[in-house]
Amino acid sequence: TSNMAMPFALSIAVSTVIIEVLLGVMLLIGFKRKFTVWALLLMIVFFTFLTFYSAYFNKVTDCGCFGDAIPLTPWQSFSKDIVLLVMILILLVNIKVIKPLFSDKINSIIVGIALLLCIFMGYWVLNHLPLKDFRAYSSGTNIPKGMEIPEDAPKSVVEMIFVYNVNGTNTEFTDKQLMDIPAGAAFVSREDKVITQGYVPQIHDFSIEKDGFDYTEEMLSEPKLMMLISYDLALANKNGLAMLEKLHQEAKVKGYKVIGMTASADEEISAVKKEFKLSFDYYFCDATTLKTIERANPSIIILNNGVIGQKVHYNDINKLKL
């Protein structure tokens, strides 16, 4: 069922955000108060359940409510939803107090303008870079510096957990309980459980690898480096890929070292290079990290000695300044 819904995930996400914004605007101007408050109540009940489920069962490690602008843990997000639920219930009880600020005609125009702005913003962020980048790889970021861990930084405390099948039930044992494992129990797996999270640098899981070798330090020392990023080449925009070789040749003339960055397998890389006649080499990096750098697929990043200078969506390649 989840796989069937995947093609619609982006549309559902964008639509949900637009609905939330419109309901917020409608509440502020007192437009269609009964519909607005009841819709807000239904929405917050759903999200309160969702955030509790995510937090309790540890389905996600951070909340996407405000993205990287205001990072929240799942439990913080659940607490936020509880507060909003209480506030909306207060609005429901006092719904008659809500009065429209303007006439229905003017209120309708305001909501219509808000809808158009939401649609425009949705279109913009899907076809260009965000107007404001709150992520760890925004322009001006020094990647090597962002990866540094201070000497006095707190270390993570990790406990080894051994899972054994005991009489048909998977049972966890710590390394101090190994002597208590019953005879005949079958080993299932070993896991590392984080007891206390240590210092996590702003930039982590970033690497540039090829054929088992790590080229991160070497590449981040390049005075003029162009990275052509596609977290998944199978999902990359064909028109975007078709522009890369011309850009590669133009950048080489200007003295840039040009590399591709992807999490795709070698077979996929070879097929794409052959189809689009790409002559630069692809290096491996974690897919989540590449999506954090830039979700456009492909996207272009310019670095100068490890400092991000320019970032462009494939639709804006002509705006790149070499």
Feature-to-residue mapping (PLM):
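Membrane-interface segments at or immediately adjacent to transmembrane helices
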Residues: M121-T216
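Solvent-exposed soluble domains appended to multi-pass membrane proteins
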Residues: E209, T216-L322
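Functionalized membrane-embedded alpha-helices
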Residues: A9-L50, L91
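Short loop/turn motifs at secondary-structure junctions and domain boundaries
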Residues: L10, P154, G198, L290-E294
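Internal/C-terminal transmembrane anchor helices
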Residues: F102-L131
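Membrane-embedded alpha-helical segments of integral membrane proteins
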Residues: V45-I98
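Membrane-interface helix-boundary motifs at transmembrane edges
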Residues: I29-W38, K96-N107
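Interfacial helix-start motif at the membrane-water boundary
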Residues: S2-I19, W75-S79
